[in-house]
Amino acid sequence: MSQPSKTQIALIGASGRMGRAIVSVLSTSVKSTLSSSVVSQSSVFLGMDSGLHSGIKQNGVNFSSDLEAAVRSADCVIDFSTHQNLDFTLKACIQYQKPVVIGITGLTELQKDALQVASKEIGIVYSPNMSIGVNLLFKLTEIAAKVMGEISDIEIQDIHHRHKKDAPSGTAEKLKSILLETLGRTSKNVVHGRHGILKERDSKEIGIHTFRAGEVIGDHTVYFFTPEERIEITHKAQDRKTFAVGSVHAAEFLVGRKPGLYDMFAVLGL
């Protein structure tokens, strides 16, 4: 009996940290394979073997800047490039009717609107964090907020490596959104850090605290404080592959799906 063909995945932003992790994960996947690895036209890695660049054996998939060709030949696209590239990715995916996983964090509201529009024509998975564990963190935070939110002081802690440019992280922003929606609060209830002489803490306040130091892959904690006890819900990423595994899982989920904007809750059935 012949083996089923593997899902062909085009990876955009393939030379970065996440790109290298996804190349590595795809090298051992039984369901999917890397069909193209796309980098910018100015990349010093153009023409290099993406497997060797990712610290694994040669895979024969060299870095290219031909986005359209990569999308055209793929079953699904994973994009971990930059904000500036998002419009080009969406345009190509719509043109060739290919689903896409968007792993770019810190999107503007206009870019999120663009995802909504594009999702009327193609399947899209967008999540600020592709980790299976982090999405469980999201769900547990929602549950805790329903049970303890109105009797607790709530704080979010976001720790990442010193190279990360956006703050708070997309994951911290998602945690904030979950809390606000669950508790019926607004952005006016959110405080980013604290300094100086302040008034006493408002009972509906949600604090967000950002650390950028060392080489931390990503730690997030949501705290629920009451006078009698404290709940801490923490996720710590120990290997960047956790995000890569989730991204590949999301791509496999999308193949054959009808157009729409999906999140990791849909992918994981949460």
From Swiss-Prot:
Record localization: Cytoplasm
InterPro entries membership: DapB_C (IPR022663), DapB_N (IPR000846), DapB_N_CS (IPR022664), DHDPR_bac (IPR023940), NAD(P)-bd_dom_sf (IPR036291)
Signal peptide: none
GO biological process assignments: diaminopimelate biosynthetic process; lysine biosynthetic process via diaminopimelate
Pathway in which the depicted protein is active: Amino-acid biosynthesis; L-lysine biosynthesis via DAP pathway; (S)-tetrahydrodipicolinate from L-aspartate: step 4/4
The protein's enzyme class: oxidoreductase
PROSITE patterns in alphabetical order: DAPB
Record-level GO cellular component terms: cytosol
UniProt entry tagged with the keyword NAD: yes
UniProt-annotated binding residues for NAD(+): G13, A14, S15, G16, R17, M18, G103, I104, T105, S127, P128, N129, M130
EC number(s) from the headed UniProt entry: 1.17.1.8
Protein known as: 4-hydroxy-tetrahydrodipicolinate reductase
Taxonomic source organism: Leptospira interrogans serogroup Icterohaemorrhagiae serovar Lai (strain 56601)
Lineage: Bacteria, Pseudomonadati, Spirochaetota, Spirochaetia, Leptospirales
